Amino acid sequence: MSRRHFGYQDKVLLLQHGSTELLALAQRRGALLHKLLSGTGIFEQDLHKPLGRLHHTDWLTLLQNCRQQVQSPELPYLLGSALLNSRYISLCQSLQYAKNLRQALAQLYYFRHQLFPCFYIRLYQQQHCIVLEFKPALGLANQQAFMLTVLCSLLLSLIKQQLGTLSGISLQLQQSEESPALQQQLFGGLNLSFNQVANSLSIPLALWQQEFSHANAAEFNAARRTCRQLNRVLPTQRALPESICRLQRRALPQLLNQEQVAAALGLSSSSLKRQLSQHQTNFASLLDEVRRDAARQLLRQGHYSNRQLALKLGYSDEHNFRRAFKRWTGLIPSSFKGLFNFN
């Protein structure tokens, strides 16, 4: 049986799915290749191999080197656009030939391990919008905001390119505001907000199935076949934190302990604990995250009392749930519920 999760030292990233584009952008801005590759296990000749791979430790080092040598706030935005328009990435080609946004995002999510294995998405409907909530699948240290910007840049560039507008779309970010003039320049027409409880992109339902300007079923199917062939080299795997959150969500309102989760993932309890420390997290924090996300999703529906929510989340006492929710969001449940219009 193949492994269901990967670690920092597993080569699950293709060099031509991000690294070569990033290096090209940095070199055009005066950075030297040998300095960009310093501290990684990547050699210059590896960059020309169609299926050359690297692991996340090298990827994070590469990002750090580029950001140190290229003091350019637009770098993640440009990288997202470069990925979308790369002729070497079949997944991105398929997005541009998709019938509509719904098909494109389904394609991106299914094959995300080929391009963005560091994120997964929670999708839900809120009033007249579809909301994509971005969750880190593994620890990205101080590169998380950069990588999230790359992903959002790719998605928003796709929408702007295919539908001609970002009107009605909202991007909510947990981070504080940075380079507001640049963000407005690159994402004009977008409603941007910062210091939010989650990273999410809200898209009006009207745009969800609007036909793409470059829709082409034959080209889409051809690109999708190439993505499937690439799965032989990059089989579908998930990072350990994501796998744990997935197990805990399925188990609610029951709570799995560390030994149960480790057994389900084919690990010893000590190995699970050690690997989580490499992701700068721990078992209790991931359980907290699952409960917080489930609580917010249930509260958005507007149908549950605090007692019902406590039972659904595995709390024996509703007061413990209220305290936990206040710690997670800074709000009591009733105040959070009041942010939404349930009519």
Where are these regions (language model features)?
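Extended mid-to-C-terminal alpha-helical interaction segments
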Residues: 177-343
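Generic solvent-exposed, charged/amphipathic alpha-helical segments
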Residues: 23, 67, 109, 152-156, ...
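N-terminal regulatory/effector-sensing and dimerization cores
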Residues: 55, 83-200, 204-207
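Short, contiguous, pocket-lining structural segments
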Residues: 14, 143, 147, 236
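Short, solvent-exposed positions on alpha-helices
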Residues: 34-35, 146, 285
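N-terminal low-complexity or simple alpha-helical regulatory segments
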Residues: 1-128
